[in-house]
């Protein structure tokens, strides 16, 4: 099992300017966060240039996150929903250009009124069907991520239900450890260790970060209360074959946090 990082801690910088640092630190696998001023996913020439830069620095793009600039595939207003679907599809094409494999998708954002939960779930599935059809023709796999409480897909059981409904080899689950820890703490749902056997046949990607079960802190492992020993043992038991992808909150000292990531990973798997 290899480790990688989401570029989230670097999102305030042009990603190109940090590739030398990543190479020096031996970080070979990335999940790209598409954000203007950080990584311009909508510019084909830029993507081709970055593809060369990644290869030149020995870096492989494993995954890309869907945009978070207002994109929400569960929106009820059809104009906004379709716009969101198209933005996600643009990131799929960007990922394809970088020879990446996994597109991380949130099933939806905040549910303002519980009465609309079922409607938003329906819209989310409608959008997901369209995105999945688009991605299947390019061989890109969608990893549906469990979200924070109060959002569409805020439980492992709901994520699992959606994935099983589509029954597609191009749709799997991205387990976000931090989100799962909060949901299990607040709503008494399955925690990060307990849920692994439930999702083992669909788990294709990870977002690894820690918290104390109250807020989405995106800490390094062992800075919160997640049972990391049990989690790593659980991954081995289900024979997880994906990348151990850290998703940490941005820090002021990027080099320090990136060095710590590597140390943290080797401490976890030792």
Where are these regions (language model features)?
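Active-site-proximal loop/turn and secondary-structure-junction residues that shape catalytic pockets
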Residues: 9-11, 34-36, 67-70, 107-111, ...
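Flexible, glycine- and charge-enriched loops at secondary-structure boundaries
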Residues: 40-43, 47, 78-81, 85, ...
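Active-site acidic/histidine proton-transfer and metal-coordination neighborhood
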Residues: 14-17, 56, 73-173
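Catalytic-core regions built around general acid/base machinery
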Residues: 45-57, 127-134, 194-198, 230-234
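Histidine-acidic metal/acid-base catalytic patches
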Residues: 1-4, 12-26, 84, 155-270
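Conserved beta-strand positions in the central sheet of alpha/beta enzyme cores
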Residues: 31, 63, 104, 143, ...
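N-terminal pre-domain/capping segments
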Residues: 1-100, 172, 190, 201, ...
């Amino acid at each position: 099992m290899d480790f990688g990082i989401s570029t989230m801690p670097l999102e305030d910088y042009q990603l190109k300017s940090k590739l030398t640092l990543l190479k020096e630190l031996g970080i070979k696998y990335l999940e790209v966060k598409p954000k203007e001023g950080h990584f311009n996913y909508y510019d084909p020439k830029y993507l081709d240039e970055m593809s060369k830069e990644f290869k030149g620095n020995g870096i492989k793009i494993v995954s890309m996150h869907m945009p978070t600039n207002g994109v929400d595939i569960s929106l009820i207003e059809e104009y906004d929903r379709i716009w969101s679907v198209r933005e996600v599809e643009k990131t799929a094409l960007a990922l394809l250009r970088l020879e990446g494999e996994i597109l991380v998708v949130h099933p939806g954002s905040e549910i303002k009124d519980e009465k609309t939960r079922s409607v938003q779930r329906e819209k989310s599935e409608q959008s997901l069907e369209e995105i999945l059809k688009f991605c299947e023709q390019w061989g890109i796999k969608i990893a549906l991520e469990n979200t924070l409480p109060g959002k569409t897909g805020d439980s492992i059981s709901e994520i699992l239900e959606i994935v099983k409904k589509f029954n597609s080899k191009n749709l799997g689950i991205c387990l976000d450890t931090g989100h799962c820890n909060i949901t299990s703490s607040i709503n008494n749902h399955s925690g990060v260790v307990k849920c692994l056997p439930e999702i083992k046949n669909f788990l294709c990607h990870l977002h690894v970060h820690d918290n104390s079960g109250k807020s989405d802190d995106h800490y390094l492992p062992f800075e919160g209360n997640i049972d990391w020993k049990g989690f790593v043992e659980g991954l081995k038991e289900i024979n997880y074959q994906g990348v151990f992808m850290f998703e940490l909150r941005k820090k002021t000292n990027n080099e320090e946090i990136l060095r710590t990531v590597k140390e943290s990973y080797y401490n976890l798997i030792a």
